[in-house]
UniProtKB/Swiss-Prot annotation:
It comes from the Archaea. Belongs to the TiaS family. It comes from Pyrobaculum neutrophilum (strain DSM 2338 / JCM 9278 / NBRC 100436 / V24Sta) (Thermoproteus neutrophilus). Keywords: ATP-binding, Cytoplasm, Ligase, Nucleotide-binding, tRNA processing. InterPro entries: C1-like_sf, TiaS-like_TCKD, TiaS_FLD, tRNA_Ile2__agm2C_synt, Zn_ribbon_TiaS. It is an enzyme of class 6 (ligase). The keyword Cytoplasm applies. This is tRNA(Ile2) 2-agmatinylcytidine synthetase TiaS. Pfam families: TiaS_FLD, TiaS_TCKD, Zn_ribbon_TiaS. One of its GO terms (molecular function) is ligase activity, forming carbon-nitrogen bonds.
Amino acid sequence: MRVVVGIDDTDSHRGGCTTYVGYLLAKEVLRRWGAGAFRDFPRLVRLNPNVPFKTRGNAAVALDLEIPEGDVEELWRLAVETVAAHSRREGKTDPGVAMAAGGVPERAKTLYRMALTQVVSISAAERAGVLTWGGRGKIGAVAAVGAYFPKSTFELIAYRRGDREAIPPDLVRLLEALTYPYTFHNVDRRRVLIEPRGPDPVYYGIRGLTPQHLRYALSLLEAWGYRPAGWVIYRTNQATDAHIELGVFYGDPLPYSFYRARGLVVEARRVAGRHLVGRLDSGLRFVAYRHLGRLASELERCLRCDVVLYGGLKPRRGGLYLYVERAYVLGRYIPARSRCTYCGGSLESLGRGRGWRCRRCGAVFHSAPIRWLYDTAPRRALLPRPGEWRHLLKPPDVDPTIPNFFSPSSAEWIG
């Protein structure tokens, strides 16, 4: 029988990691039911990063399994016991578990689409038609059960025992040179991106498109002495634009949702800290942080540009602000003087208050209003520097259809 188990919210700001609990659960499933129980790689499901209840990256984990029907209750007990034993119950942490047996309900799939962009209630998760346990974490757990990946990437997550030893940037650049574009987002200038900076048990995480290239990257780091205590390859919706292609968008801006807004930039100015604050002609205000790099600097020069902005909506100073994560410039409105209505010739001024005269036919006009021309030459995408990419953002050089050709039987995926 097909059974999908989801877990979420097992970590806190002081430690822990939901992917690590998923790794431990996957090891137990392997021990009891063998590798044949896995219909797919374990899934790392990124959700709306703007919700105020998240710990760090707002990720849930799911296992898509095939086990005997009589073992379903045993699997449920195993999942609940594993989460309960390894959760960090501190601060906002409120772990949850969800399970669907025999098939995934459509309501769970809909909840996944909502959780990519919106704030979802616990009651909505409880009505999704799957078995649940725990607190607020059941929202992400149900979303992970309902997650489906038309496009995907992989991430090899290695776990540490003891202190995290820093990996030199030069070694990470070598790793990327040997594996790019089949691994990506490894280093940004001198900043190593594969190592987290928090107190969680993750040693490093390498994103890629094939399990084989990820295993090669792992062996390269091991050869240089950076050996993890354990590792697992997750299939994930990272770097796929899943929130844009599958997420639910509402017409009205809602707090803590991921939002898409099109409009004319009528204001863009730097404030304290060199952050950019601006406004669209609709009245929606937006913010682009200085450390976004080219995205903020180019958006500053986009006055009178027709743009599409993507980002998270957050309350600020009594209103909602869109915190920009990416932008698309569709065109710019350029002022141009009206031409002669008789012959189409250009007009010259006769002096202040005296009107305008056609250079070609001599016709005189009392006024020459400005015409606005729409220029599509500036059309381009504005992306942040790699170190500031959100997890779901798809880099322009990544093909998230490649991972669809791989299954757990095609490569070693856990160790």
